[in-house]
UniProtKB/Swiss-Prot annotation:
Protein species of origin: Physarum polycephalum (Slime mold)
Region (Disordered): 1-27
Alphabetical GO biological process terms: methylation; rRNA processing
EC number: 2.1.1.-
Name assigned to this protein: rRNA/tRNA 2'-O-methyltransferase fibrillarin
């Protein structure tokens, strides 16, 4: 369940899809 968006212009990845980093992101 990787459905999350990045916060800082990056793709999110993770169960909750928290804040994203510079490139990837994820929670």
């Amino acid at each position: 369940x990787f459905e999350g968006r990045g916060g800082f212009g990056g793709r999110g990845g993770g169960d909750r899809g928290g804040r994203g980093x510079g490139g990837f992101g994820g929670g």
